[in-house]
Amino acid sequence: MLLHNKTLAGKALAFIAEEGYVPSMREKFLGWNVPPEYSDLVHPHWRAFPAPGKHFHIGLAIIYSMLLIMSLVGNCCVIWIFSTSKSLRTPSNMFIVSLAIFDIIMAFEMPMLVISSFMERMIGWEIGCDVYSVFGSISGMGQAMTNAAIAFDRYRTISCPIDGRLNSKQAAVIIAFTWFWVTPFTVLPLLKVWGRYTTEGFLTTCSFDFLTDDEDTKVFVTCIFIWAYVIPLIFIILFYSRLLSSIRNHEKMLREQAKKMNVKSLVSNQDKERSAEVRIAKVAFTIFFLFLLAWTPYATVALIGVYGNRELLTPVSTMLPAVFAKTVSCIDPWIYAINHPRYRQELQKRCKWMGIHEPETTSDATSAQTEKIKTDE
């Protein structure tokens, strides 16, 4: 609950700023257990809020423990099956494996948060904060650009099925680019060259600083917002828009030809293959939508921190976007398990106990062989 008595808050903040932390108020305000030498990790904004009860921390620890298990099981399963199945070792699926790796990197944050929740402070202080933030920065920006790469691949594969498919070398170059993309805004705050990492919310998680009231912080947050969110979003919307346009034009052409030939349908084996690819594209679009749902609240919080009304930024309102982001990294692999036809076939073969029933299709085999030939070029 937000402290409404402004006079009391002002006195508390003044005393805290002078003394570093206040033993007599340990059960009342955030930052009560942060010693003076680490006081820079806690922005004065958070010190005006009552410290959350232990049950809040335990609740978060339980939630993140469940998310950790789901993420590791799901993403490791994706990497295992896509990497060891010949029919799934295609350039397009290299992006899926890359996305799963970024999701696992995000999962590395979760044990740190669980431990921090029981300690009611950030584990490892400044070093722990930096490590936690680096994991979040790499995984968040990596997921964004990998989603953009998947959108580009789906557009090329479906719009130009004969000569538009990426080969393995091209896919590897794009994946390497996604790793390059995450580097600047991960390393600069880490080295404190531009921006910095600091605690947020319940002070058991860390991210880049979006509360310091100076021009340097405003410019940094604006740039990372454009770099990590806006640019990937533009690419994703562009490629999926073109993909939808291509599908509509293709279907329109088939209807017109069928009408001229006085037949019901002109669907061939190639069109059945295209239908399977469209199904996979729908999976990719679903994951993009989940990404948007997860990271838009976090981006909004950061912008409010530098440009908006900071009274809206309570510990709870800044912790929830982090939970959403972690949840999506756990859901991604299960979306594929439910919807990806060839992935379901492999799961059916290797994990019969899951009770999956996905029939073998000629179109899937043809698609796999086509991509395999393209890979070897």
Swiss-Prot record:
GO terms for biological process: detection of light stimulus involved in visual perception; phototransduction. Residues 82-93, 153-170, 248-282, 340-377 are cytoplasmic. Signal peptide: none annotated. The keyword Amino-acid biosynthesis does not apply. CDD domains: 7tmA_photoreceptors_insect (cd15079). Phosphorylated on some or all of the serine and threonine residues present in the C-terminal region. It comes from the Eukaryota. PANTHER family: OPSIN. This is Opsin, blue-sensitive.
